[in-house]
């Protein structure tokens, strides 16, 4: 009985593990390493202190970042490149409320989930919050 319990727990452990490197594979978007700190006390980013607000940060990722406040002290950071388009003049997304809009195909992606009903969701990056500083990295 103990062997079966051990086997069941071990199986659940290995099934629950995932490699975040594999979950962000997208043939349209290269994988660049970066790390940026966003200071919420700066006027450009102060709107991120409020739920459901988003800002565009142009200097990281493939086409910049879209940073979104999900519930007060939790944030999502997505690449601003359209995830289902080759890189082109129209593939930088814009913020439209709680969605990101791809100008190429007019598809919208939810900034809470990154989903847009297409084969690839938004490319999501890691986020750490320490006080009024948001660190976003890949």
Residue locations for each model-derived region?
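Positively charged n-region of N-terminal signal peptides that target proteins for export
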Residues: 1-4
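Sec-dependent N-terminal signal peptides
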Residues: 7-8
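C-terminal motif of bacterial Sec signal peptides marking the signal peptidase cleavage site
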Residues: 13-16
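N-terminal pre-ligand scaffold of iron-sulfur
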Residues: 20-97, 110-111, 123-138
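Short cysteine clusters
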Residues: 82, 102-104
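Extracellular/periplasmic metallocenter environments
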Residues: 104-119, 133
